[in-house]
Amino acid sequence: MEQLVNELIQANVGRVLVDEPLARYTTMKIGGPADILIVPKRVAGIEKTLQLVKKYKTKWTVIGRGSNLLVSDLGIEGVVIRLGEGLDHLEVEKHRVRVGGGYPLIKLSTLLSRQGLAGLEFASGIPGSVGGAVYMNAGAHKSDISNILSKALILFEDGTIDWLTHGEMEFSYRTSVLQTKRPGIVLEAEFQLQIGERERIVSVMQKNKDYRRETQPWNHPCAGSVFRNPTPYFAGDLIEKAGLRGYQIGGAQISEMHGNFIINTGGASAQDVLSLIALIKQTIKDKFGVEMHTEVEIIGR
């Protein structure tokens, strides 16, 4: 591992941090250390990192802004690549938008709404990166990334870079081909938006923000929606009907505001959260006969 660290530093791939606690990089404020954390300066740094990872046969993981993510208390083995400042370029040409995978989604939706571009209003309260949003087909307010994405530039595990069209992304509810058949890193996304009335777009954005602020616990560290909605039900409704609202294990608590959110009340461990998730799954299955599946991504040792 020491030799890999030295080569990464010599290759100038970006910031190289050893045994770096990941709690500071997630919205849940939970997570043990990464053996090696890379914050790349540019795409070339990611490419070189993957070359060295392959050379040393080391595991690797990619994270964005750390939303919708639960990292194990034991951390993550191998190399963790955090997308951000090196992939935050933006190009707007009429209604076509090309944006780096590390660009903050809320910042993008706000900026484009002020320019009178419609289509990203649903993302006004999603605290992730563009890359992460494309990866998991993030959505809210009856819309999602699949409705606006035309293509995405992907760096695949073997080091090749290629564009995937909307069809090739194989989007479905909170999933894409990147989670299943073709793992890779979203370097860039191209969105097709609509030119609209600025005042109306900004108004919709504000309504969406107000709704999230009034119904979801964004004043506490959390990872967003914990479970996917098991059609035709809503996960939060089932959890609340089961009487689990406010239930707490350690520092992790099912939110009083919304049953599908688990908050970190202070000092929560990943195990606290996992125990709550297991409790919810079993309770919902026993009471309603419904299988619950997590939307939050659980990673680590």
Curated annotation (Swiss-Prot):
Keyword NADP recorded: yes
BP-aspect Gene Ontology terms: cell division; cell wall organization; peptidoglycan biosynthetic process; regulation of cell shape
Pathway stated in the Swiss-Prot or TrEMBL entry: Cell wall biogenesis; peptidoglycan biosynthesis
The UniProt record lists the keyword Cell division: yes
InterPro entries in UniProt: FAD-bd_PCMH, FAD-bd_PCMH-like_sf, FAD-bd_PCMH_sub1, FAD-bd_PCMH_sub2, MurB, MurB_C, MurB_C_sf, Oxid_FAD_bind_N
Protein's cellular compartments: Cytoplasm
Active site: 174, 225, 295
EC number: 1.3.1.98
Gene3D superfamilies according to UniProt: 3.30.465.10, UDP-N-acetylenolpyruvoylglucosamine reductase, C-terminal domain, Uridine Diphospho-n-acetylenolpyruvylglucosamine Reductase, domain 2
GO molecular function: FAD binding; UDP-N-acetylmuramate dehydrogenase activity
Annotated ranges, domain FAD-binding PCMH-type: 29-196
Source organism, top-level taxon: Bacteria
Catalytic reaction equation(s): UDP-N-acetyl-alpha-D-muramate + NADP(+) = UDP-N-acetyl-3-O-(1-carboxyvinyl)-alpha-D-glucosamine + NADPH + H(+)
Cellular component, GO, one term: cytosol
Disulfide bonds: none
Homology family: Belongs to the MurB family.
HAMAP family according to UniProt: MurB
Annotated function: Cell wall formation.
Protein name per Swiss-Prot or TrEMBL: UDP-N-acetylenolpyruvoylglucosamine reductase 1
Encoding gene per record: murB1
